[in-house]
Amino acid sequence: MSVRHRIASSGVFGAVTVAVAGPIAGLGFSRLIGHLPTAGPLSRLAAAVVLYGAGLAAVGVGYLALTGRLGDLRPVRPDAEEVRLVAAVTAVLVLAWVVAVVGLAVLGVPFAGNALTAQADGGFRISLVLLAGLSLVVIAPTEELLYRGVVQASLYDVTSRRRAVVAASVPFALAHVPTLYADTSEPSAVGLSLIAVFGLSLVFGWLHARTDDIVAPTAVHGGYNCLVFCLLYLVGV
């Protein structure tokens, strides 16, 4: 049996391997920033995001190529129903975020941001606008490619779709732990935000399981992140 067939026949092994290798490759690619002619904090931020995303994409595309599944990346043009679904889910998620942030602030409950929004806290508010754009073209596409298009999809043949959604959401959430700790070292705040990230991942995973394509989860993921960053900029965070 060839390497390709051995890997393809083990959905769990492939999913775990990709889930671990993706963030490692992303961090490895990010280290290349020291060799790039970045002029300031904004260009360094953009380079870091792009390089990390390139690492995720390299692992995801590499695995699909190795297993003969590159055809899975062919985008499916969404129909009117899917467009309405994307718009509705994005609106609900953003509204839920607003309610949660206001509610936690009123109750005085701390929660963690991440290493990206920490730049805005450091006086670079314009970075939020940059991140809004990067969410649409880099962050959401590469994360959804890896965690939904590869990890979750690889589990469909070995377990139920519901379990695949949950299983793929675990490494997605854990991959965000370092960025959450970059904003605060308070364990309870990090834990609360980690639960929120896990919840978001469940929604993205549900969309993939429903549509069998990464277009819908990518659109919702990117739209949600973009709108949140824009709202943070508008309120002066």
Regions flagged by a language model, labelled:
Residues 1-8, 71:
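Short, Lys/Arg-rich, polar N-terminal cytosolic tail immediately upstream
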Residues 6, 10-15, 44-52, 81-89, ...:
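Residue-level signature of transmembrane alpha-helical entry/exit and packing/kink sites
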Residues 10-25, 87-95, 167-171:
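Alpha-helical transmembrane segments
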Residues 13-67, 119-123:
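Alpha-helical transmembrane segments in multi-pass membrane proteins
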Residues 25-50, 105-114, 182, 186, ...:
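Membrane-helix interface segments in multi-pass membrane proteins
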Residues 26, 30, 59-64, 97, ...:
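Structural signal for membrane-spanning alpha-helices in multi-pass inner-membrane proteins
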Residues 37-44, 70-140:
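Juxtamembrane helix-loop-helix connectors linking adjacent transmembrane helices
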Residues 128-237:
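Transmembrane helix-loop-helix hairpins at the membrane interface
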